[in-house]
Amino acid sequence: MAQIIDVQAREILDSRGNPTVEVEVLLDDASFGRAGVPSGASTGVHEAHELRDGGDRYLGKGVRQAVENVNEKIAPAVTGLEADDQRLVDKVMLDLDGSDNKSNLGANAILGVSLATAKAAASSANLELFRYLGGPNAHVLPVPMMNIVNGGAHADSGVDVQEFMIAPIGADSFREALRMGAEVYHNLKSVIKSKGLSTGLGDEGGFAPSVDSTKEALDLIAEAVKKAGYKLGEDIAFALDAASSEFYDKDKGVYNFEGGEHSAEDMVKVYEELVENYPIVSIEDPLQEDDWEGYTKLTAEIGDKVQIVGDDFFVTNPARLKEGIEKKAANALLVKVNQIGSLSETADAVQLAQNNNYRCMMSHRSGETEDTTIADLSVAYSCGQIKSGAPARSERVAKYNQLLRIEEFLGDAAVYAGRSAFPRFNG
């Protein structure tokens, strides 16, 4: 296999206008890979460390140190390694960093090299990235979980839940699912406008109307689904990302939700009522990131009807996921490559989840680039679900468009996950 001969990093801008790391890896057969590293707004305390410069430049968010770490420390260490030995490349970087959370070199430095190496190796093997990583049997196209109303840390809308997503479960193909989602999205704009609300957008391309409650937001989307000519619960289902750590008061031990202070038990009842009244297939981070007992209880209560997804709760970390499996806390893993900081560790987390019947949802971050790696990963790892924001804004649509290409490449072998991706329809 071709060897790494050059690694170069640079500082670029993400979709929020903040700096991030881009890395290029060159092999001795002239194969090449490039990767841009995403960044989150609501970040879990257990995530791998994203290295920022501090100071005045870019309001402290510069990544020149991470870039320097790639160019001056990581590059010499991985030069000469075979690009198809992903685990060795990642191990060399992890050993070089030496910390528990990648705080010395920066997860944003390590991940950039890790992803760019995989892309270069795929190019060298003359394979699509999804085929290189997933092998000849990778053929399942994921359900796009489109975030069409943004709240929480992603917008100034006033609603506490961070993401209101639609899942086109009734589609026969990814192409049809994308069309359905786009049609609902455009109809939602007219519904919001007709109510005299703002059609401004949040970080992930969804609308950010000033609504007072979760139910009000869901009702707006339900109206848009109907207006688009689709049946709620048959063609289109709902999914939520509560990102509840963002409205949890650690000092008081309560959730400041919709104008009141609520206990974990109260929140469990809130979610039970929502699942009862709306066709919700997935709830992400319903409780704060260290409430193991609460997650276990919630999963026991409604886990047979709905997917309970650990994002900040698991942070794509195999060790935390293992604990969750043992405690029967949550039943699905949100997969964010930059939470753990290397491709090998991401693959380990996905495999651990799937081996224990936990579903996986591949995910973008609110600060994205035009990089489409996660689209390929969602197919390579047979996730069956992906969230990449609204069907608008090019950094979001880039991933969905890549999935269109993959579906076209697979031809008759392509299978759209559809309803089978969720426990509500596939218990």
UniProtKB/Swiss-Prot annotation:
Its cofactor is Mg(2+). Binds a second Mg(2+) ion via substrate during catalysis. It is an enzyme of class 4 (lyase). Keywords: Cytoplasm, Glycolysis, Lyase, Magnesium, Metal-binding, Secreted. The active site is at E204, K336. One of its GO terms (biological process) is glycolytic process. InterPro entries: Enolase, Enolase-like_C_sf, Enolase-like_N, Enolase_C, Enolase_CS, Enolase_N. (2R)-2-phosphoglycerate binds at Q162, K336, R365, S366, K387. The keyword Lyase applies. SMART domains: Enolase_C (SM01192), Enolase_N (SM01193). CDD domains: enolase. Its EC number is 4.2.1.11. Gene3D superfamilies: Enolase-like C-terminal domain, Enolase-like, N-terminal domain. It catalyses: (2R)-2-phosphoglycerate = phosphoenolpyruvate + H2O. SUPFAM superfamilies: Enolase C-terminal domain-like (SSF51604), Enolase N-terminal domain-like (SSF54826). Mg(2+) binds at D241, E284, D311. PANTHER family: ENOLASE (PTHR11902:SF1). Belongs to the enolase family. Catalyzes the reversible conversion of 2-phosphoglycerate (2-PG) into phosphoenolpyruvate (PEP). It is essential for the degradation of carbohydrates via glycolysis. This is Enolase. It comes from Corynebacterium kroppenstedtii (strain DSM 44385 / JCM 11950 / CIP 105744 / CCUG 35717). The gene is eno.
